[in-house]
Amino acid sequence: ASSATMTTINMVFEKFGLGKYFSGKISGADLKESKPHPEILLKAAEMAGENIQNCMVIEDSTNGILAAHRANIFCAAYKSLHTHNQDYSLANIIVSDYDELEVGKISKFF
């Protein structure tokens, strides 16, 4: 799920071969509300056929983190060199490298 256009989402999926890891895609155009409303995250969980307790959101923006918090979905805030002035206080964990999201490191949260 991304608030980006489906064209952008498809480009990223194709470039990185992500299709095999996801059961569907949702873009901002598919929604009535935008972040920080949790609609996009709840729809993604529903599309995946998963209970929100089994889901994790990786977000790099204040609005995305707030949306995850409002949806009661575990949120890993991704802090990069390109994200500035974001509020990570509502995230469950803050990471600066995707290696920090390995199953062995985050399984204690589920």
Q: Would you name each region that the model predicts?
A:
Residues 2-4:
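Conserved phosphate-coupling serine/threonine residues in phosphotransfer and NTP-handling enzymes
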Residues 6, 10-110:
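Asp-based, Mg2+/Mn2+-dependent phosphohydrolase catalytic module
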